[in-house]
Amino acid sequence: MSNVSMKAMLEAGVHFGHQTSRWNPKMGQYIFGERNGVHILDLQKTAKELKKATAFIKEEAKKGARFLFVGTKKQAQEAIKSEAERCGAYVISEKWLGGTLTNFQTVKKSVERLNELEKWEREGVFKAISKKEASRLGKEMVRLQTLLGGIREMKSLPDVVFVIDPVDTQGAVKEAVILNIPVVAVCDTNADPDNIDYPIPGNDDAARSIKLFCAAVADSIIEGRTEAEGPKQPAQETPAAEVENTIMAQALEGALTEEVAVPAEKTVEETVKPEGAVVIEEGEEIEEEEKLHGREEKKAKKEAVKKKPVVKKAPKAKKVESAD
């Protein structure tokens, strides 16, 4: 829930009301006094009512409620549009069309008409017709964009209506009351708080005061939706010691498996060999036998050569030359 300090409200001029001649006696419970012909609001009561209103808004936001911001006076337009956009609320900041809530089906048809005109413009239809007709359709499109731009995505009635100055936008308040839609409103000293579910006594003419209230409501909506989504759980990291123990256990298990396990293809007799024994495969055994026969044959030949008697040749006779 958004908390607004007394200092912030004083700096924004929240405590300034209307002239004493323009007050509504029903707002008397929220008035602190009078100064220079102007009523001064009790900021302690303002803080209390603002806290109640934002608590309600936050709870509704948790439930997935849809909000409509309404503020059509010039000094409220910028603040109410920007804050509604920030918190994802619908907004009407130009003019309240009678029947926006009570005749919502007609409003939906107007939105469909707006979508159709924008489609024609994209497809170049305006260029294919007369300039007079194109101008007429263009003006109609701009008018609908201005009036319905902030609610064109609103497929059903809102769950809560937030109003700046219920006197200026009394049409919105009346329609919300008829449809039993809760109303939260910033009420100056000239307002009637009876039809407001959550009245917030405050200055509804100063731009800074309006900005403060709009921001507080938007913050409450964002907080409620964030809490409804729940905090994001960070990925849990496995402790280093646990990882090390797991690796050691796997390594030990693998070593034991290699030492004890008997391959399915071999018999126990083939697997269990004396220490230091050399295991020879079938092909290697034949090759080794051939090599052994070859060595034995060579050895026999050598022995035969040794046993064979050696015959010495007689020396050649020397040739004697005859003497003539």
UniProtKB/Swiss-Prot annotation:
Keywords: Ribonucleoprotein, Ribosomal protein. It holds the Pfam family Ribosomal_S2. Residues 273-324 are annotated as: Disordered. One of its GO terms (cellular component) is cytosolic small ribosomal subunit. GO terms for molecular function: structural constituent of ribosome. Residues 304-317 have a biased composition (Basic residues). Belongs to the universal ribosomal protein uS2 family. InterPro entries: Ribosomal_uS2 (IPR001865), Ribosomal_uS2_bac/mit/plastid (IPR005706), Ribosomal_uS2_CS (IPR018130), Ribosomal_uS2_flav_dom_sf (IPR023591). It comes from the Bacteria. One of its GO terms (biological process) is translation. Coiled coil: none annotated. This is Small ribosomal subunit protein uS2. Residues 290-303 have a biased composition (Basic and acidic residues). It comes from Elusimicrobium minutum (strain Pei191).
